[in-house]
Regions:
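Charged, flexible cofactor/metal-binding loops and thiol motifs
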Residues: 52-157
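P-loop NTP-binding/switch modules centered on Walker-like glycine-rich loops
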Residues: 3-81
Length: 157
């Protein structure tokens, strides 16, 4: 067992035994899944999605969350080979001078001109349990997605 795994297990044991709450900041989504009950996904300093862990990992709503989850390695090589990875194009915008409206719009494969680059979306329920909120005008409708699904124009646009 690695040192990282031992520390994570200790944190979980302490949380269970003493009723602790953690704010756990990480980029490793497998670690986040192991340690967290609820997950917030941030992009350029703003929360773009917040949900209970299982809901977020099985039905993400924000395209950035979907792209992150598509990049998480899976232990089964057969599944890994056949899974579509959503690759975000373009450069990450400057956090000092973020884009107007939706901060993710310059890299978003679901971008709709005249809406995403003009109107900032609210962090509200976008389908699913009321505790699952996302900051997106055109949230993901199903998961897992193929790259083609991700690039498809949102319905009604």
């Amino acid at each position: 067992m690695s040192v990282q795994a031992q520390i994570l297990n200790l944190l979980k044991d302490l949380q269970r035994d003493f009723g602790l709450t953690y704010v756990f900041i990480a980029h490793d989504l497998n670690v986040v899944r192991h340690i967290s009950d609820r997950v917030m996904v941030m992009y350029l300093g703003q929360v773009v999605e917040h949900a209970y862990r299982d809901e977020l990992y099985t039905a993400p709503k924000h395209p950035y969350t979907g792209a992150l989850l598509s990049a998480v390695p899976v232990p089964d090589p057969e599944i890994g080979r056949n899974r579509k990875r959503i690759v975000l194009e373009g450069d990450v915008p400057s956090p000092i001078n973020p884009p107007n409206a939706c901060r993710f719009h310059p890299r978003c494969p679901r971008f709709v001109e005249g809406r995403c680059d003009v109107e900032e979306p609210e962090l509200v329920n976008r389908g699913g349990p009321s505790t699952h909120v996302a900051k997106c005008h055109y949230p993901l409708e199903r998961w897992p997605l193929s790259e083609e699904d991700m690039r498809r124009a949102p319905a009604g646009v």
